[in-house]
Regions:
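Active-site-facing substrate-recognition patch
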Residues: 1-52
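Conserved acidic residues
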Residues: 51, 113, 143
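PRPP-dependent phosphoribosyltransferase catalytic core
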Residues: 6, 129-180
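Short Gly/Thr/Asp-enriched flexible loops that form oxyanion-binding sites at enzyme active sites
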Residues: 62-71, 130-132
């Protein structure tokens, strides 16, 4: 068991009966918890050679930025569509009830670049899968995905077969488990 797990607050029956909400804000509010989360996520990168960390809006920023800083690597934000001011590349993807788009500054990701994608959560894998495709469209290679939490019962990892995927804390639950 990761030491980070003690800082995650589990709230039963929220937002509705049968769901266990995994609240990571309790990790962020505690200096020791935050340090552990960033350190353990960084350890998951191991000896992987890479050029930049790509963080997904918004909680991927919370962990990706300090990881990039500690490793002296670039940080590249992937945002919801319409949030970046320079020329972007974007990709649409399906959600459970609709669709969404994410984008990145086109010039920030260059052909041949090797990146690690960081987010807070592997759930269904849809956003992470879209981010992998977005990076690959620009000629870069995703060499690893690192997240704080994984909800194994939602099988998101099954969509992320093109590169190694790591999570610090995994919950076995199927539906009825969520995280924010």
């Amino acid at each position: 068991m990761s030491k980070v797990e003690q800082y995650i607050t589990s709230i039963p029956d929220y937002p509705k009966a049968g769901i266990i909400f995994r609240d990571i804000t309790s990790v962020l509010k505690d200096a020791d918890g935050l340090r552990l989360a960033v350190d353990e996520m960084t350890e998951k990168i191991g000896d992987t050679e890479f050029d930049a960390i790509v963080g997904l809006e918004s909680r991927g920023f919370l962990f990706g930025m300090p990881m990039a800083y500690n490793l002296h690597k670039a940080f590249i934000p992937v945002r919801k569509s319409g949030k970046l001011p320079r020329a972007t590349s974007r990709i649409a993807y399906d959600l459970e009830y609709g669709s969404a788009e994410i984008e990145v500054h086109r010039e920030d990701i260059t052909p041949g670049m090797r990146v690690v994608i960081v987010d807070d959560l592997i759930a269904t894998g849809g956003t992470l899968e879209a981010a992998v495709h977005l990076v690959e469209q620009l000629g870069a290679k995703v060499v690893k995905i690192v997240c704080l939490l994984e909800l194994k019962g939602l099988h998101g990892r099954d969509r992320l077969t093109s590169c190694p995927t790591e999570a610090v804390v995994s919950y076995e639950g199927k539906e009825g488990t969520t995280a924010h």
